[in-house]
């Protein structure tokens, strides 16, 4: 068995996180909102949110948000100016959630968020981090499309959570999606440090240390257990 509960035999916590960014290039663009939940297991075996952050981050002096980002997220230059913090403050808040470790970092399309996160953490020492990409899992569970909004609908969570292109809403939604995935099939642990990528485009951005990257196409239906990406990797 490799279900959600078993992950807490290996990790002190899951840190579910999401970013909103000023663009798509981690080298040129910045995180403008960073949200995260630290999820721990109680002695009774229940999951609880042990810590939470939702932080806006100021842009470098003289920079402004592209209009399409404002439209998509609702985050404005004025909001970042009045409510945003310096990047170092955001990092300090984030590091409080990843310690004590070890922790498992969880995100939907984790490759994107992890690349931006590493840029934010440059010069800091977060320690060793493992990764779980719910997008890779979801590609084995449902046919295209595979956005978080699609997972919310697939697991009938739309009355419980919202997907608003705001980081804090997305991490709360992903927590519920993760639990629904676990109820559906007990193999989440087999996806740790395994990122699927579209073979048509290759891996986007830098490769995250410790992560195994494997081509993963689109399925027309839920993948049988023996045909999931981890199962195929185990037979190599």
Predicted regions and their residues:
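Acidic donor-binding loop at a coil-to-helix junction in glycosyltransferase catalytic cores
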Residues: 168-169
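Active-site catalytic microenvironments for nucleophilic, acid-base chemistry
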Residues: 120-123, 140, 154, 177-184
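Short, structured loop/turn "capping" segments at alpha-beta junctions
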Residues: 127-132, 145, 160, 185-189
């Amino acid at each position: 068995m490799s279900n959600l509960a078993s992950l807490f035999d290996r990790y002190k916590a899951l840190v579910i996180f999401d970013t909103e960014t000023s663009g798509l290039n981690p080298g040129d663009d910045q995180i403008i909102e960073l949200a995260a939940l630290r999820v721990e297991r109680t002695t009774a075996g229940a999951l609880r949110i042990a810590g939470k952050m939702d932080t806006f981050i100021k842009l470098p002096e003289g920079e402004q948000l592209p209009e399409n980002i404002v439209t998509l997220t609702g985050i404005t230059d004025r909001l970042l100016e009045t409510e945003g913090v310096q990047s170092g403050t955001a990092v300090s808040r984030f590091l409080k959630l990843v310690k004590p470790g070890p922790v498992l970092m969880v995100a939907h399309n984790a490759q994107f968020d992890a690349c931006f996160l590493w840029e934010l953490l440059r010069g800091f020492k977060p320690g060793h981090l493992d990764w779980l990409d719910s997008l890779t899992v979801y590609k084995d569970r449902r046919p295209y499309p595979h956005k978080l909004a699609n997972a919310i609908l697939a697991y009938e969570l739309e009355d419980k959570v919202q997907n608003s292109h705001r980081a804090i809403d997305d991490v709360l939604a992903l927590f519920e999606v993760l639990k629904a995935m676990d109820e559906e099939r007990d193999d989440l642990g087999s996806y740790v440090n395994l990122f699927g990528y579209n073979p048509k485009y290759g891996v986007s951005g830098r490769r995250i240390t410790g992560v195994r990257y494997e081509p993963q196409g689109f399925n027309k239906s839920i993948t049988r257990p023996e045909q999931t990406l981890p199962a195929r990797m185990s037979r190599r």
